Amino acid sequence: MSRLAALLAAGLLGACTIAPQPLAPVPVGTDRFRHADAPGAPAPSLAGWPASFGDAPLVALVDAALAGNFDIRAAAARVDQAQALLGVREAALSPTVGVDPSFNRSRVSGTVDNALPKRLMHNWSVPFNASYEVDLWGRLRGDAEIGRQNVLQADADRAAVRLRVATEVASDYLTLHFVEEDLATLARAIELRRTALDVIAARVRAGAASDLDALRAAADLDTARADLADSRRLRENLVDALAVLTGVSPTSFTVAPTAAAIRVPAVPPGLPSVLLAQRPDVYAAARRVDAASLETGVARTAWLPTLTLTAQGGFASRDLGSFLERNSSLWGLGASVAETLFDGGKRDAAVAAATAGTALADANYRATALGALREVQDALNDIAAQNERIVRYDSAARSTEAAARLSLSRYAHGYVSYLEVIDADRDALNAQRQLIHSRQALAIATVDLVRALGGGWTPPSVAPQNVAQRDDRL
């Protein structure tokens, strides 16, 4: 009983409200990212980021995915569901009113002595009833607030899905663009090697070259053709992936990347301390912590009594003609207090479970926040590395191409064997393809950075009941 009294006093002194515990800040260490061009500068708005690549088909594909992707539709349905459940929780704060009209017609036996003046009787009754639970300890308001946090979490989860889908579309499309470049490079190499094979065959027939040179040239041509087949397979797989992302069957989907060069934008990352407010997944994790903290507060109110007010009223009469007369009216008022005296430890277990749930949500929140910081830093690391690779492979591509031309000229004059030509040609092709792959990796790393920075998302400024009407266009 002393424990119950203490809980009652705590509930009264706490102004009868339940609020989530404030989140402790996540330590970010040094408030700057490595490889950031302007470490102290704020990150620019990323709204409309797909257009920054300067490719209209990319923007159109992202818009199509945001409109047709089924993962996004499922996430939107979860928001609608959370809003509906919020309505259920908020309804508990209002009184319930009901009506139970009835009509009975009965006949009394004529062979049994009774004092009733009539053997055939009618009973008309229309009683109304109302009940209202007084939210003394904030349990119902706390439960409604849990529903609001769930709506905000579902809305942030939807934004995270939209961002994931948009960036996956961008990554696959950009990869497809560079695969097309790779295919063009391989096609040129195959044409050159086919021509070289014809020249060598003529030299063999003239006795100026050996069969070994012809065999090496044929093997080199077949290797390039095998690489071409593999790149074509990759192109088809990317088109299929884009089809599914846009909500279309792969059997009826086509896409043709523009032939123009992709413009890879520079994306300043801003400050680590600001990043956590820009990520929808971090925001959703924080709302899960708030909801779990509220669950703990609501669970503790189970130790406190509940007060319910009831009221009845209406009319009842044997004759329909006198049904609405004053003497036919009836009413009643009441109040009840309920308190559980023994439940075998159920309430203690519920509080312990809710407390553990709060600790779990808090740990997940911190892991999500640290993961967000890592994703930004990893993307910056990739961008720095790919920029360096592009410089090196660009120089290597020019050098190896010149070496390949020189080697072919030397072979034509009989100064070197065809093995040297093959090696030089292979080096030139590898350098060209590595340059393409590095440019592709730079574009993908930039998309990864956009995703890691939240893609221009901002926390909702509207009520939870209206989050479905938010404009989340990228």
Please report, for each region that a protein language model flagged, where it lies by residue.
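Terminal intrinsically disordered/low-complexity segments used for targeting and assembly
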Residues: S2-A67, W124, R148, R232-A277, ...
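Short flexible linkers and secondary-structure junctions
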Residues: T17-V169, T306-A311, G344-V351, T358
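Sec/SRP-type N-terminal targeting helices
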Residues: R73-A74, E90-A91, V134-R162, L212, ...
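Short sequence motifs at beta-strands and strand-loop junctions characteristic
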Residues: K118-H122, N327-S329, N430
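Hydrophobic, lipid-facing positions within transmembrane beta-strands of outer-membrane proteins
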Residues: H122-A130, D172, L271, W331-A335
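Periplasmic alpha-helical coiled-coil/stalk elements that build and connect Gram-negative outer-membrane
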Residues: L140, A156-L271, D382, L406, ...
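A short glycine-centered flexible hinge/capping loop motif at secondary-structure junctions
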Residues: V204-A208, Y411-Y415, A452, G456
